[in-house]
Design a protein with these regions (language model features):
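Amphipathic alpha-helical repeat scaffolds
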Residues: 33, 125-132, 261-266
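Structured adenosyl-cofactor binding patch, chiefly the S-adenosyl-L-methionine
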Residues: 98, 139-140, 154, 159-166, ...
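Active-site/ligand-binding-proximal alpha/beta "capping" segment
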Residues: 193-258
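Glycine- and other small-residue-rich loops at beta-strand/loop junctions that grip anionic moieties
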Residues: 6, 29, 122-123, 148-149, ...
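RNA substrate-binding interface of SAM-dependent RNA methyltransferases
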Residues: 42, 68, 76-77, 82, ...
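Boundary-proximal intrinsically disordered activation/regulatory segments immediately upstream
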Residues: 1-65, 151-153
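Short, aromatic/basic amphipathic alpha-helical patches
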Residues: 60-72, 242
Length: 285
């Protein structure tokens, strides 16, 4: 890694960092902080540029990261603290930021690994919730994650931080049409299971998109088979279009008076029930 010293906010590389941070170059991601950049190195993503300050070299962890970066073929820049503050997305920068290639997967990549357990995020709007769901999906042994159209970007700064780097490791197919996802899942015999708000009687039927389906308690469902678990947006749940395509609907029992769970919390409960049924047999991706 060749390193240049930069003290001006008008430097072209500094401007490029700011453009990428603002989302102007979709094929690149802006990463900030020691942990995310360590995760990116471990995940094997391609680095375009790395920027750091003297503060990074003041800690043992920072020195270890610098040592790892010596073997990364990319452009390096030693910034003044003032210039780092100009490109940083956080109030208290840790002294390191990077531009890396955005991971790129399609739905076939996500569904290729067997036995399949895939998460589908349907129109989630909160980046923190999506990032936490990605992190939980990886921890519970999911093969990958799919987002439907109108879902927040899983690689946005807040999503990436909430995922604790999982979004750089877990295959994610982004922004797909619900019907395309359903057709490909059915073609591969992957059952679509959508989380739902519970009806008054957990075994009663509900009408959804002109179809009558049973809503079962999540512990009654067989998660050992190939499944795609669908979680909907925070306020309204799984969209009607997506729930109408689901093979089964499930819910989490709750005490009276409780309207709903946070989608990340609901995801953790259901994903770990699936992992339990699968004997916590986590396959290495």
């Amino acid at each position: 890694m060749l390193v240049e010293k930069i003290t001006s906010r008008q430097n072209p590389l500094v401007k490029r960092f700011r453009r990428v941070r603002a989302g102007a170059e979709h094929h690149l991601l802006f990463l900030e902080g020691t942990r995310l950049i360590e995760d990116a190195i471990e995940a094997g993503v391609h680095f375009e540029s790395i920027a750091f300050t003297s503060a990074l070299e003041a800690t043992a962890r920072g020195l270890s990261l610098m040592d790892s970066l010596q073997n990364v073929p990319c452009r390096g820049a030693h910034l003044s603290q003032q210039v780092m503050e100009a490109i940083a997305d956080t109030d208290s920068p840790q002294g390191v930021a990077a531009l890396v290639n955005r991971p790129s997967y399609d739905i076939e990549d996500v569904l290729a690994v067997e036995p399949q357990m895939v998460v589908i995020a349907d129109q989630l709007q909160d980046p923190g919730n999506l990032g936490t769901l990605v992190r939980t999906a990886e921890a519970a042994g999911a093969n990958g994650l799919i987002t439907t159209r109108y879902t927040v970007d899983p690689y946005n700064h807040k999503s990436l931080r909430a995922s604790m780097g999982a979004a750089l490791r877990l295959p994610i197919a982004n922004g797909l049409a619900a019907r395309e996802v359903a057709e490909l899942c059915k073609k591969r015999n992957v059952k679509l299971i959508a989380s739902s708000a519970a009806p008054p009687d957990p075994r009663s039927t509900i009408e959804d998109a002109a179809l009558v389906k049973i809503v079962r308690t999540f512990t009654e469902v067989n998660f050992k088979r190939p499944v795609a678990l669908i979680f909907g947006r925070e306020a309204s749940g799984v969209s009607q279009d997506v729930s109408s395509l689901a093979d089964e609907l499930i819910h989490i029992p709750m005490a009276p008076g409780v309207e709903s769970l946070n989608v990340a919390a609901a995801g953790a409960i259901i994903l770990y029930e699936a992992a339990r049924q699968r004997g916590f047999d986590f396959k290495q991706r």
